[in-house]
Amino acid sequence: MSDSAVATSASPVIAQAASGEKKVSTKKAAATPKSKKSTAAPPSHPPTQQMVDASIKNLKERGGSSLLAIKKYIGATYKCDAQKLAPFIKKYLKNAVANGKLIQTKGKGASGSFKLSRSAKKDPKPKASAVEKKTKKVNASAARATKKKSSTSTTKKAAGAADKKLSKSAPTKKSVEKKRADKAKAKDAKKTGTIKAKPTTAKAKSSATKPKTPKPKTKSAKPKKVVSATTPKKTAVKKPKAKTASATKK
């Protein structure tokens, strides 16, 4: 009796374990199709926001682009079914008008014509990814480190060159000072020699100049030629002709 009771009590436990294994297997089977959905091919066209903005920008209509024109442009350029994307396009148009990105020139809702606002016409700069930012930071830090190393090396070189210049300039300064001292001594010696010699030369000059008496120089006055103011010209005197025949006839 006891053995039969143990067998009956153990049988429901085994049944529960088997049912638990079945549930786990069904959960795993249900999880597998999700992974298949995640591996689905990405869409061949860009998001609707980008397609609508590009279509309005490239159509360049003065009165604004209509919904039909936007659909035709999207279907022709991106080669996708514009009818399936129509609800997404309408939703974006309404939100863009509310946000101020698009201007509705005609109609109401999504059935009118639309133009890009001035802020939307400017091409937005693409945001840099986190990886690019990290690489830029790493490159900047590396560049700073190299700059610091180069600056320290240059400062060390400059300090060494300055020390060398100082060591070279020190003896030159001493030699210059010695030369200056020698020149000053020579100048002093010259000054003392000239002061002593000056009175002797002055005495010699005075003795030499005293006996000499300057002789008055007399220039012989040359007789000046007297030029007569009016020199009388010699007048030719006519001689009287000898009376010959007339005198004898009388």
UniProtKB/Swiss-Prot annotation:
Where do the H15 domain residues begin and end?
A: 44-118
Compositionally biased spans, kind Low complexity? 27-42, 151-161, 192-211
Can you supply a Gene Ontology BP term from the record? nucleosome assembly
Bias category Basic and acidic residues: which stretches?
Answer: 120-133, 174-191
Which SUPFAM superfamilies does the entry link to?
Answer: Winged helix' DNA-binding domain
Q: Where in the cell is it found?
A: Nucleus; Chromosome
Enumerate the GO terms in the molecular function aspect. double-stranded DNA binding; nucleosomal DNA binding; structural constituent of chromatin
UniProt feature, compositional bias: Polar residues: 1-11
- Provide one Gene Ontology cellular component: nucleosome
Top-rank taxon, per record: Eukaryota
Question: Where is the stretch described as Disordered?
Answer: 1-53, 101-250
Here the segments flagged for biased composition (Basic residues) are 212-225, 235-250
Q: Which UniProt keywords apply?
A: Chromosome, DNA-binding, Nucleus
The principal location of this protein is nucleus
* Role of this protein: Histones H1 are necessary for the condensation of nucleosome chains into higher-order structures.
The record's similarity note reads:
Belongs to the histone H1/H5 family.
Q: Provide the protein name.
A: Histone H1.2
